[in-house]
């Protein structure tokens, strides 16, 4: 087994809690997201999956890169915000990762996106990169 979904599913099999908060190695949760998670999960017990907004920043990004990749950049320099990611899931056997690349979760029956208002404005994942790393990553994904 050698693709991303397989690796993530192996990690899921090791989890013992009611929910799993799975983030990539280069993502950081905001402090507000960490603080609000217990209350969020307790008050919405029927949701099996949560979509979390992600703040992407790319140091060295130029207008040429933005045009080449068709990205949107807001006034804060955030790329493609809110860029929702499936990162919080109920720990049940039906929910698994699928696809070798650009993997996605399957097997859930209900989901909700964290809103961008109502006190959730600062609840997001932080995903910083450099342009060199972004170009290398794009080239890698093109080979898969």
Locate each region found by the language model:
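Catalytic-site signature of metal-activated, phosphate-bearing donor transferases
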Residues: 5-13, 19, 28-144
């Amino acid at each position: 087994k050698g693709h991303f979904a397989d690796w993530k599913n192996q990690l899921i099999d090791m989890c013992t809690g009611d929910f799993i908060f799975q983030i990539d190695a280069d993502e950081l949760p905001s402090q507000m997201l960490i603080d609000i998670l217990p209350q969020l999960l307790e008050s919405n017990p029927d949701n099996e999956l949560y979509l979390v907004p992600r703040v992407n920043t790319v140091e060295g990004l130029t207008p040429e890169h933005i045009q080449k990749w068709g990205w949107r950049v807001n006034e804060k320099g955030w790329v493609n915000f809110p860029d929702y990611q499936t990162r919080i899931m109920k720990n049940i056997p039906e929910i698994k990762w699928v696809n070798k690349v650009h993997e996605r979760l399957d097997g859930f029956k209900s989901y909700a996106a964290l809103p961008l208002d109502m006190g959730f404005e600062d609840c997001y994942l932080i995903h910083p990169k450099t342009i060199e790393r972004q170009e290398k990553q794009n080239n890698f994904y093109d080979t898969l």
